C-alpha cells in the first residue's frame, strides 16, 4: 500500500514540479541567447526580467487560489460549479493583468530611469519591458489554467504545456535574436517577443485541451 501511495504521489507531483518551472525555463533560455550581445544587453535583460516576474507574481497568486478552490469543489463533489470558478477567475485575471500592464507602461519608464545608473542600460531595459509587458496577458491566463488542472490532479498536461513553451521559446529566440532563417535580427527585443509568443502558444494549447 505504501509503495502504491508513494508512486501515486510522485505521478502527480513530478510533472507539477517541472511544469510550474515555466517562467524560469523561459528566462534561462532567453539569457543563453542574449549572453552574446554584450554587457549592456545582459544587464538590461536581467533587470527587465526581474521587473516582469515581480508583476507576474501577482497573477500567480490568483492562480494558486484557483487551484485550491477547484480542488476543494472537486473533492466535495461540487463539480458543476467548477466551470463558474474558472470563468470568473479568468475574467478577474484579465482585469488584473490589464491593470499591471497599465502600471508598467505608465510608470515603468520613470522607475527604470530613476533606478538605473547607466542611461544605455536604462534605455535597453525600457525597450525590453515594452515588449515583454504584453506577455503578462498570456502568462496570466496560462497560469489560471495551470491552477485549474492542478486542482483536478491532472498534472501531466501541465508538463506537456511547459515543454511546448520551452521548445517554442528556444526556436523563436533562435529566429528573432540573431536573425536566423531569413528573420530580421532584433537583438534584445527578440527575447521578449519570443517569450510572449511562446506563452501565448502554451495558453492556447491548454485552452484547446480544455475545450
Give short role names for the model-derived ranges.
Residues 93, 148-175, 189-196:
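Alpha-helical transmembrane segments of multi-pass membrane transporters/permeases
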Residues 1-13, 70-137, 168, 183-211:
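Short alpha-helical transmembrane segments in multi-pass integral membrane proteins
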Residues 28-32, 102, 144-148, 167, ...:
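Alpha-helical transmembrane segments of multipass membrane proteins
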Residues 6-25, 29, 51-58, 134, ...:
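Residue-level signal for short hydrophobic patches within transmembrane helices
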Residues 34-53, 119-124, 188-193:
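Interfacial/gating helices of multi-pass transporter permease domains
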Residues 25-28, 36-39, 73-76, 151-152, ...:
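Helix-loop interface residues and adjacent transmembrane-helix termini in multi-pass membrane transporters
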Residues 16, 20, 31-32, 68, ...:
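Transmembrane alpha-helix boundary and packing residues in multipass membrane permease domains
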